[in-house]
Design a protein with these regions (language model features):
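Core beta-strand-centered patch of the WYL/Sm-like small regulatory domain
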Residues: 2-125
Length: 125
């Protein structure tokens, strides 16, 4: 019997594949990060000099370590350690983004959502 990924422990490889696919397909995800629920749009997946996987993402909902994300209508750009993500799954909803400074999250980039403009499910809307 297959158990849904969200109902069991996910490996780092499974989470990497899900986050990478979400970036390529411009799909939002939900995940726990250090035990707090986050709603994220992963934009860049890569690793830093020590080889630690990182996700540069736009957090548009959920919690932060300091409490709920402010209800200002906008989100926050985050650089998250992939190894700290758990219970990750794609969710239905619009791809969210806003202008940002050049990312310094990952030194070696594996995937950048900007390289896949045709994947936007909103067709640029």
């Amino acid at each position: 019997m297959n158990v849904p990924a969200s109902a069991r422990e996910q490996s780092t490889d499974e989470i990497y594949r899900l986050v990478r696919a979400a970036a390529v397909q411009h799909r939002p995800i939900t995940a726990l990060y250090d035990g707090t629920r986050r709603l994220l749009c992963p934009h860049v997946v890569g690793y830093n000099r020590p080889g630690d996987w990182r996700v540069f993402c736009y957090q548009y909902g959920g919690e932060t370590k300091d409490g709920p994300l402010p209800v200002s209508g906008g989100g926050i750009w985050r650089c998250l350690a992939l190894i700290k993500l758990s219970s990750a799954e794609c969710v239905t909803g619009p791809w969210r983004t806003e202008p940002h400074a050049p990312q310094r999250c990952g030194e070696h980039i594996e995937v950048d959502a900007d390289d896949y403009p045709g994947a936007d499910p909103q067709n640029g809307q």
